[in-house]
A protein has these predicted regions:
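Conserved catalytic cores of ATP-dependent inositol ring kinases
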Residues: 1-275
Length: 275
């Protein structure tokens, strides 16, 4: 969300005009809190992707897996193919260890409602402890469902983007010889809130290796909606002096405002001296 400036002092959202497109362009934050390098790759809005390098040598890839090409699974596009939003695809430290973020795309195919034709990209799983060609032995999986009760529709990017998924469970897997084994899982159970608008988290149930381990329940205060009779608001008559305390407060300043001071008895003359 912070404003970026292109090398040469050019704002990133300004029309480049006849300036030649470059395959990689460096950007800088307007306020430098710490050093980091921000690089945009690609030559037009349909193929842009980003890389950020911190002072410690950690690489953050947005819309690309490794900084070599656009990854279409990690971007949200409009109908013309222009990229509207880039998602974090990988974090890699200076030693080559990395975490990979995978996403799932959902398109709303319903008809006759405000969500019709909307799209969204949500986090599907995170694979970590990766190195080299090995993606890592640990994985966090996010299971979601659609048609959330308090779904949101956003159109500030020029396209209908939804926030319609409800998180149902978070699962941790360990890959043993390429096969995922469940280590633990957290299931989320919801109830309807007041006015049936917002779902409320009722309980979180934890499982270890597929077996029930523990649960935590939540309780909420539900107040009764009621109405009272009309209240009468009385105001002073408009002819009554509204600032009746002003004369009293001004009386202490009367001497300074109304007393007449006579000129000084000392007269002044002009002299040239010695005459």
């Amino acid at each position: 969300g912070e404003s970026l400036t292109m090398e040469g002092g050019i704002k990133a959202n300004r029309n480049p005009g006849n300036r030649p497109a470059l395959d990689s362009v460096h950007f800088f934050t307007r306020t430098m809190h710490t050093y980091k390098k921000i690089i945009r790759y690609g030559t037009d809005p349909t193929g842009y992707y980003w890389e950020e390098v911190s002072a410690g040598g950690t690489h953050f890839y947005y819309g690309t897996l490794d900084g070599s090409s656009l990854d279409t699974t990690a971007v949200l596009r409009d109908g013309s193919g222009n990229v509207l939003r880039w998602y974090l695809r990988r974090i890699q430290d200076k030693w080559g260890n990395y975490v990979t973020y995978n996403y799932a795309a959902h398109n709303n195919t319903s008809t006759g409602n405000i969500k019709s034709g909307g799209k969204e990209l949500v986090l599907d799983n995170i694979r970590y402890t990766g190195y080299g060609s090995t993606p890592g032995n640990y994985e966090i999986v996010f299971e979601t469902s659609g048609n959330r009760q308090d779904a949101r529709v956003m159109m500030n990017l020029g396209e209908k983007i939804l926030d319609d998924r409800q998180l149902n469970s978070v699962k941790v897997n360990y890959y043993d010889n390429g096969t995922p084994e469940e280590v633990k899982r957290f299931d989320f159970h919801y109830i309807n809130g007041d006015f049936d608008v917002h779902p409320l988290l009722e309980k979180v149930v934890e499982y270890r290796s597929g077996e029930y381990f523990y649960k935590h329940s939540f309780e909420y205060h539900h107040s009764t909606l009621s109405f009272h009779g009309a209240s009468t608001l009385e105001v002073s008559d408009r002819n009554q002096m509204l600032f009746e305390d002003i004369p009293n407060s001004m009386s202490g300043h009367r001497a300074a405002l109304f007393d007449e001071y006579k000129p000084s008895g000392i007269n002044t003359t002009t002299t040239r001296g010695g005459s």
